[in-house]
Amino acid sequence: MRNLLDLSQDELANLLSPKFRAKQIYEWVYKKNARSFDEMTNISKDVRENLKSEFYLDPLTCVRSETSKDGSIKYLFKLTDGKTIESVLLPMKEEISSEDGSVERHARYTICVSSQVGCKMGCSFCLTAKGGFVRNLSAGEIVAQILWIKRENNIPYERRVNVVYMGMGEPLDNLTNVSKAVSILKDNDGLAIGARRQTISTSGLASQIKKLGELDLGVLLAISLHAVTDELRAKLMPINKAYNIAAVMDAVRAFPIDMRKRVMFEYLIMDKVNDNLSDAKALVKLLHGIKAKVNLILFNPHEGSQYQRPSIENVDNFRTYLQSRGVTCTIRQSKGLDISAACGQLKERSKVEM
């Protein structure tokens, strides 16, 4: 049997007659949250029985969830082959001014999804890397994370949702399936999550950044930089030996980005590793001529890590210097730290307690 979520609407239409059935099914699955074909009451019983014999709708089983004191929720999902992945819901608040001048607070959601079971990149600061690489996720397994989390939390279809490919795995090492997931999520008959609400993060696979740009999906790009010299970056991120900083920056400069948006550079700050003012100065030079936003991330500790969280003073000084030189810079508020759901803390669980 096949995972129906792996199919774009066009692919599904090519398998069905009449073709408009594909739109009906898409709307049932993505807009009406149908979890079985039996719920699709405007489709004949014979067609539903045929669909049940060929497809399944839910490739994920939630093994457990943990809720952080900040409201973040981490989910451990089991796939059909027994492998596991983790995803995170990050609820936030945004203020919207109404016509009468009053300010209303609305929930805004970001869903952090995994693109692989494990990861090949071997970054020394990341817990996901400790378990090695197992396999790529299919497009449907990626889409299912968003669909399941939205459904579980009763997030209205029309509510604003952002998707960040920053969970387990290197998204550009699974570019075919990630790009297909982006397109499925964009479908207006599906979840209708626009490309500008989807951010793909990469450790710096320069050749794949180029391929992603050629696909012209309209997604936002985030670069996990974390160091300003090749020597240090190669120690932190072995991928730098294949694609050094210069190669990554060349790929970024060639990447098509919306005029209203910026390329995000993620910079994980670690105590006495990359947190001094000389690093900040070198970063400003490195980003010269690029419409960039720097996201400073305080290292999130995990068992067995050789790194430590930096002092708030050093982080503030780092940010202040970047801003004084005209670089847009924010300090990411790490959500889910108390449930190991923050950056670099997700991992595959080979033995799951059911």
Curated annotation (Swiss-Prot):
**Membership in a protein family:** Belongs to the radical SAM superfamily. RlmN family.
Q: Organism source for this protein? A: Campylobacter fetus subsp. fetus (strain 82-40)
Cofactor(s) annotated in UniProt: [4Fe-4S] cluster
ATP-binding found in the keyword field: no
Which keywords are on file for this protein?
4Fe-4S, Cytoplasm, Disulfide bond, Iron, Iron-sulfur, Metal-binding, Methyltransferase, rRNA processing, S-adenosyl-L-methionine, Transferase, tRNA processing
InterPro entries of this UniProt entry? Answer: Aldolase_TIM, Methyltransferase_A, RlmN_N, RNA_MTrfase_RlmN, rRNA_lsu_MTrfase_RlmN/Cfr, rSAM
Function as written in the Swiss-Prot or TrEMBL entry: Specifically methylates position 2 of adenine 2503 in 23S rRNA and position 2 of adenine 37 in tRNAs. m2A2503 modification seems to play a crucial role in the proofreading step occurring at the peptidyl transferase center and thus would serve to optimize ribosomal fidelity.
* Record localization: Cytoplasm
Binding positions for S-adenosyl-L-methionine per the UniProt entry: G169, E170, S201, S224, L225, H226, N300
**EC number annotated for this UniProt entry:** 2.1.1.192
- Cellular-component GO terms for this entry: cytoplasm
EC main group? transferase
Q: What is this protein called?
A: Dual-specificity RNA methyltransferase RlmN
For this UniProt entry, the molecular function terms from Gene Ontology, in alphabetical order, are: 4 iron, 4 sulfur cluster binding; metal ion binding; rRNA (adenine(2503)-C2-)-methyltransferase activity; rRNA binding; tRNA (adenine(37)-C2)-methyltransferase activity; tRNA binding
- Which Gene3D superfamilies does the record cross-reference, listed alphabetically? 1.10.150.530, Aldolase class I (3.20.20.70)
- Tell me one Pfam family matched here: RlmN_N
Keyword set includes 4Fe-4S: yes
